[in-house]
């Protein structure tokens, strides 16, 4: 809303430039876009109420660090909201190492139990990972004939930084 403020982060200068241009075009004054990586967010400790990610975490080679960073930038009581592809069972090695499937967010998908463990290790609570079975129809179109939906599905992932948690930026 008008009282809020949004910080967008992308690792490519082209996307940051496009986002800035779109913000100007839409006359949004409460947004800014920064160049950075999800493993090292250019955001101060405890500065965010919400961290949102859409199909990016799968591309990270260091997912535990991604969750530690999200935890760091969230204020106490802040929320994490993610939409990404998760593994419902361990994909075969040829799928895990397939560059096309990795780029398509399927080959590098983490098991749900592993994601929960990473998030808990980062300090998150109230973790909820909800697979979306209806996503299988469009995921199958990403890699026809590969049976990827035997192993992966889109999910919404939510978690909360505990209110009792204090970090360097919390009052």
State each model region's role.
Residues 39-50:
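A short acidic, Gly/Pro-enriched loop at the edge of an enzyme's catalytic core
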Residues 1-41, 65:
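Class I SAM-dependent methyltransferase SAM/SAH-binding core
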Residues 55, 69-71, 119:
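Class I S-adenosylmethionine-dependent transferase superfamily signal
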Residues 49-62:
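A short SAM/SAH-binding and catalytic strip from SAM-dependent methyltransferases
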Residues 118-171:
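C-terminal lobe and adjacent flexible extensions of AdoMet/dcAdoMet transferase-like proteins
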Residues 86-106:
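Short, glycine-/aromatic-enriched active-site segment of Class I SAM-dependent methyltransferases
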Residues 64-79:
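A short glycine-rich, Lys/Arg-flanked "PGG" loop and its adjoining helix->strand segment in the class I
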Residues 1, 59-61, 74-76:
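Helix-to-beta-strand junctions that scaffold the AdoMet/dcAdoMet cofactor pocket
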């Amino acid at each position: 809303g008008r009282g809020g403020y949004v910080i967008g982060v992308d690792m490519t200068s082209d996307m940051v430039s496009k986002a800035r241009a779109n913000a100007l075009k839409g006359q949004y004054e409460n947004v800014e876009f920064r160049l950075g990586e999800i493993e090292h967010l250019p955001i101060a400790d405890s500065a965010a109420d919400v961290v949102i990610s859409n199909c990016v975490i799968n591309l990270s080679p260091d997912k535990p660090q991604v969750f530690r960073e999200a935890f760091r930038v969230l204020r106490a009581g802040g929320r994490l909201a993610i939409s990404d592809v998760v593994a419902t069972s361990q994909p075969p090695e040829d799928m895990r190492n397939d560059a096309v499937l990795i780029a398509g967010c399927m080959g590098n998908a983490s098991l749900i139990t592993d994601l929960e463990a990473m998030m808990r290790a980062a300090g998150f609570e109230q973790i909820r990972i909800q697979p979306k079975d209806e996503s299988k129809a469009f995921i199958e179109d990403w890699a026809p004939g590969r049976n990827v939906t035997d192993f992966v599905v889109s999910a919404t992932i939510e978690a909360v930084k505990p209110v009792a948690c204090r970090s360097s930026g919390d009052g």
